[in-house]
Swiss-Prot record:
It catalyses: N-acetyl-L-glutamate 5-semialdehyde + phosphate + NADP(+) = N-acetyl-L-glutamyl 5-phosphate + NADPH + H(+). It comes from Mycobacterium avium (strain 104). Pathway: Amino-acid biosynthesis; L-arginine biosynthesis; N(2)-acetyl-L-ornithine from L-glutamate: step 3/4. It is found in: Cytoplasm. One of its GO terms (molecular function) is NAD binding. The active site is at residue 153. PROSITE patterns: ARGC (PS01224). CDD domains: AGPR_1_actinobacAGPR_like, AGPR_1_C. The lineage of its organism: Bacteria, Bacillati, Actinomycetota, Actinomycetes, Mycobacteriales. Pfam families: Semialdhyde_dh (PF01118), Semialdhyde_dhC_1 (PF22698). Catalyzes the NADPH-dependent reduction of N-acetyl-5-glutamyl phosphate to yield N-acetyl-L-glutamate 5-semialdehyde. Keywords: Amino-acid biosynthesis, Arginine biosynthesis, Cytoplasm, NADP, Oxidoreductase. This is N-acetyl-gamma-glutamyl-phosphate reductase.
């Protein structure tokens, strides 16, 4: 391992790329000179100062965005790819095997080629170790890895909400997920339906009835921990806020709340970024904004025989950039909590 890790961020003009840079600037390795920020790249925005896109990143404001190509990214020890799906695979193929590549896009998340091709309409590029350390066995796969696929934001919330119950076989393998999200999850590209006048004061479901691309990713993660095929009904809802996901997940159960809470406590007791809320308290997105934390609550609707598991995360931190930095830390043999906070910004 190099004495000083040189890090590049591709897609630095976008929300995820900017959030990765924010976290790197606060990383102790950056403060100690063990990590330096090299190339910051973009596509259409190449040639413009980073500060035009992220004025809050004042230490890097005068950096000029370079084109996103392999020649610019070569020579870095770590490369974060914060690119639209379909763009990461070609770049990754051109970078050295010793380069740690952390992909925040969808290209390498799914193990099922048919599912990838159905939902993304392109050939499957393969799969990489999945960057959700809280999943069973994930840390072992991430330590020393040189290729990492960061999970999608919705799957992160849904998997963290359901993992303990599914792993302990306390719920049926058919789950319903209704998740509300802020608009930053849709990216920074200009879109009519994301204009302020369209979003403010309105909530809107989209890609319903199994159409959302995160549906097979949620099913894949739950199947991996349960050893069973799992069906997922997923409804995403856009709400008028910039950040945050609140996922409400339900599944049939005959287990009492005491058994369910015991499973969640056993699973998450030692997890640094998971906060299992006391009975009677419920997660809210405002409590996790800016942090890598996930706040989780569980309850049982006894009349319906249903587990209700709720998770709140910041979609740009635990849902993307925070998971990327957490995975980088593990891959480099650093404490996984470095540069990441469990403390949100409120109100």
């Amino acid at each position: 391992m190099a004495d000083v890790m040189r890090v590049a961020v591709a897609g630095a003009s976008g929300y995820a790329g900017g959030e990765i840079l924010r976290l790197l600037l606060g990383h102790p390795a950056y403060a100690q000179g063990r990590l330096t920020i090299g190339a910051v790249t973009a596509a259409a925005s190449a040639g413009s100062p980073l500060g035009e896109h992220h004025p809050h990143l004042t230490p890097l404001a005068q950096r000029v965005l370079e084109p996103t190509d392999a020649a610019v990214l070569a020579g870095h020890d770590v490369v974060f790819l914060a690119l639209p799906h379909g763009h990461s695979a070609a770049l990754a193929d051109q970078l050295g095997a010793d380069t740690l590549i952390v992909d925040c896009g969808a290209d390498f998340r799914l193990t099922d080629a048919a599912a990838w091709e159905r939902f993304y309409g392109a050939p499957h590029a393969g799969s990489w170790p999945y960057g959700l350390p809280e999943l069973p066995g994930a840390r072992e796969r991430l330590r020393g890895a040189r290729r990492i696929a960061v999970p999608g934001c919705y799957p992160t919330a849904a998997l963290l909400a359901l993992l303990p119950a599914m792993a302990e076989d306390l719920i049926e393998p058919a789950v319903t997920v209704v998740a509300v999200s802020g608009t930053s999850g849709a990216g920074r590209a200009a879109k009519t339906d994301l204009l302020g006048s369209e979003v403010i004061g309105s909530a809107r479901a989209y890609n319903i009835a199994g159409a959302h691309r995160h549906t097979p990713e949620i099913a894949q993660g739950l199947a991996a921990v349960s050893g069973r095929d799992v069906t997922v009904s997923f409804t995403p809802v856009l709400i008028p806020t910039s950040r945050g996901i609140l996922a409400t997940c339900t599944a049939r159960t005959t287990a009492p709340l005491s058994a369910l809470r015991a499973a969640y406590e056993k699973t998450y007791d030692a997890e640094p970024f998971i906060y299992l809320m006391p009975e009677g308290q419920l997660p809210r997105t405002g409590a996790v904004i800016g942090s890598n934390a996930a706040h989780i609550a569980v309850a049982v609707d006894e009349a319906a025989g249903v587990l209700v598991a709720i998770a709140a995360i910041d979609n740009l931190v635990k849902g993307t950039a925070g998971a990327a930095v957490q995975s980088m830390n593990l891959a480099l043999g650093w404490p996984e909590t470095q540069g990441l906070s469990v403390i949100g910004v409120a109100p």
